[in-house]
């Protein structure tokens, strides 16, 4: 659910905040300067790969934006790859990442592993044209935004929330039209309820450009 929480908590309907996870292993690599210990995410970052595998919130948005800006400073003409497996989350956190993706010079290739729901679906579609991919069993979910705790407070407060959610929905519709092959009328209808698309359906919808069945086709898309 595209929305927000005053405390940065989970806002995607039915999704619980992740509990304790397994310990991420670290490993050593031999370099010209000796051995270097690092974790898988650091290794991916060295290869200009960003992994969005959590809910989209202020913390994850800050992490993603920082990585985008650093990779741009390292090489502004080389692609960045963003792997996505996310249930979505905060609207404002999503727009912060979205704007940064459009702002940096490198083209952003997006690859969906598992799912890209709600806010994460928008980020998937915002990748560079021709470089938005999904694995065969990935799914993409689009729906209208919602504001947490809406409907409470004085009449003037409710009106403010109503105006804001209308603004959010208008932005979402225009953005999905921009990054898909659908019309505004089609998108308006399609996001009224949860709209779950398979990788093939997302391809037909225009949210991605290719269903990635083999890794052999991936390097050709990266400059």
Curated annotation (Swiss-Prot):
Which reaction does this enzyme catalyse, per its entry?
Hydrolysis of proteins to small peptides in the presence of ATP and magnesium. alpha-casein is the usual test substrate. In the absence of ATP, only oligopeptides shorter than five residues are hydrolyzed (such as succinyl-Leu-Tyr-|-NHMec, and Leu-Tyr-Leu-|-Tyr-Trp, in which cleavage of the -Tyr-|-Leu- and -Tyr-|-Trp bonds also occurs)
User: Does the keyword Cytoplasm feature in the UniProt annotation?
Assistant: yes
EC top class named in words? hydrolase
Q: Which GO terms describe its molecular function?
A: ATP-dependent peptidase activity; ATPase binding; serine-type endopeptidase activity
Q: Name one GO biological process term.
A: protein quality control for misfolded or incompletely synthesized proteins
Localization per record: Cytoplasm
Q: Where are the catalytic residues?
A: 118, 143
What's in the keyword line of the UniProt record?
A: Cytoplasm, Hydrolase, Protease, Serine protease
Q: Which domain of life is it from?
A: Bacteria
The protein's matches in Pfam families, at most eight in alphabetical order, are given as: CLP_protease
Give the intrachain disulfide bonds.
none
What Gene Ontology cellular component terms go with this record?
A: cytoplasm; endopeptidase Clp complex
Enzyme Commission no? 3.4.21.92
Q: Sorted alphabetically, which PANTHER family does this protein's record hold?
A: ATP-DEPENDENT CLP PROTEASE PROTEOLYTIC SUBUNIT, ATP-DEPENDENT CLP PROTEASE PROTEOLYTIC SUBUNIT-LIKE-RELATED
Report the function annotation for this chain. Cleaves peptides in various proteins in a process that requires ATP hydrolysis. Has a chymotrypsin-like activity. Plays a major role in the degradation of misfolded proteins.
Q: How does it assemble?
A: Fourteen ClpP subunits assemble into 2 heptameric rings which stack back to back to give a disk-like structure with a central cavity, resembling the structure of eukaryotic proteasomes.
Give the family from UniProt: Belongs to the peptidase S14 family.
- According to UniProt, the name of this protein is ATP-dependent Clp protease proteolytic subunit 2
Species the sequence originates in: Leifsonia xyli subsp. xyli (strain CTCB07)
Q: What is the lineage of its organism?
A: Bacteria, Bacillati, Actinomycetota, Actinomycetes, Micrococcales
Q: Which gene encodes it?
A: clpP2
């Amino acid at each position: 659910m595209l929305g927000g929480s005053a405390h940065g908590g989970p806002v995607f309907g039915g999704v619980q905040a992740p509990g304790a996870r397994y310990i991420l292993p670290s490993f050593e690599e031999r370099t010209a300067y000796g051995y270097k210990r690092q974790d898988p995410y650091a290794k991916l970052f060295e290869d200009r790969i960003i992994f969005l595998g959590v809910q989209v919130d202020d913390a994850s948005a800050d992490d993603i934006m920082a990585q985008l800006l650093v990779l741009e400073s390292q090489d502004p003409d080389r692609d960045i790859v963003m792997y996505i497996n996310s249930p979505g989350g905060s609207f404002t956190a999503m727009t912060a990442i979205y704007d940064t993706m459009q702002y940096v010079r490198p083209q952003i290739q997006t690859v969906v592993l598992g799912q890209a729901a709600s806010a994460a679906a928008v980020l998937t579609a915002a990748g560079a044209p021709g470089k938005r991919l999904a694995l065969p069993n990935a799914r993409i979910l689009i729906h209208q935004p919602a504001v947490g705790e809406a409907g409470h407070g004085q009449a003037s407060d409710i009106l403010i929330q109503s105006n804001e959610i209308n603004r959010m929905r208008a932005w979402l519709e225009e953005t999905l039209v921009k990054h898909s092959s659908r019309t505004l009328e089609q998108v308006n209808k399609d996001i009224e309820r949860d709209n779950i698309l398979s990788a093939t359906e997302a391809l037909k919808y225009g949210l991605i450009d290719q269903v990635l069945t083999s890794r052999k086709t991936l390097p050709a898309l990266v400059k």
